[in-house]
Each structure stands twice: as C-alpha cells, then as structure tokens.
Amino acid sequence: LVESTATGIHSLTQSFSVASGLTYTASAYFKRGGQNAAIIELISTFGTNKWAIFDLQNGVVGTVGTAGIAEISSIGNGWYRCSVSAQATSTGTGYLNLYIARNSTDSSASYAGDGYSGIYIWGAQLEANSASASSYVATTGATASRGYDNAVMTGSNFSSWYNQEEGSTCVEFKMSQPPLTGYYN
C-alpha cells in the first residue's frame, strides 16, 4: 500500500456482514515499506475504539483503542502478523480498515504522504466467532471455513529423529477456550 501525496488517510477498506454479540478477529501480515507503522480497525457495527497501531520497526503493539485486543508476532525477515479482536455491538455492515501510520502513537492516521512510502500487506483475513487469529486460510473472495489446526505424530515418518525414550518437545499455543477447573476423571 503506497501513500498518495494528498493529506488524508492512506488505507484499504473491506465491508462485511456482522452479527451482534460475536467476536471478530481481523489480521494481516505487514512489513515496513518506508513507513514504520500500520493500523487495523474494525468499525461501524463495532462501536468505537476497536483499533490498534502496530510498530513495524520494533515489532511491538503501539497505541490500542479502549475496546480492542491487539497482538503482533514476528514471522521473520521484517514481516509481522498483526491482529485486532473485538465484539460486535450490533448487526449490520462492518468495515475492516488497514491504514498506513507514521508512528505507533499517532492514531489520527491522516497526514500528507510523499507518494512513494508505505507498507507491505499480505494475507488480510477476517474471522467470525474467533477471539484470536488462526492460521491463514487462502480464499478467492468467497467465505471459507476449515477445521481447527491439529498437530499429530503418527506412523513411522518421524522415527529417524524422534525417540520416545529421550528428548524434549516444545509447543507454543493459545487456548481457544477458557481452561477447565476442578477434578475430571
């Protein structure tokens, strides 16, 4: 996304149908392209302040609106997966906006562009009834769905490097449901 020389907001916008009460997560992959920050915003049926600024130079979440939940993860080579999650407050048409920002604290997003700077954007995705971003699902404009990501080790394809008797396994994950408490048999 390259900014124009006009004074204004330099952005991409996509509309979508929203059901009240559901949590939606908007995510995209960003990389610096002359500007240092990006904004993801969910508006209209989400009320106000459902946005976050992402610092693409330092790989951190900058300013966050009062009602959004923001996350950033480095995927290497200067690319970051950024996301904002928010609950819809009404049914109707919502809008996902992706903005260029000059820094991670200026939420106005309106400025005079230079005509050549910007940010790289790839893999923008919106997920309904999701409290965080799942893995990327390629689509061609139509709604797509798939099952949960499932990591399973079966068969003998891994026997050359995996020894059941020794070693360590490290797994990073995010709970999609609150943890259960109490005793279960």
Question: Whereabouts are the PLM-identified features?
Answer:
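Extracellular and organelle-lumenal recognition/adhesion modules and their flexible linkers in secreted
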Residues: 1-185
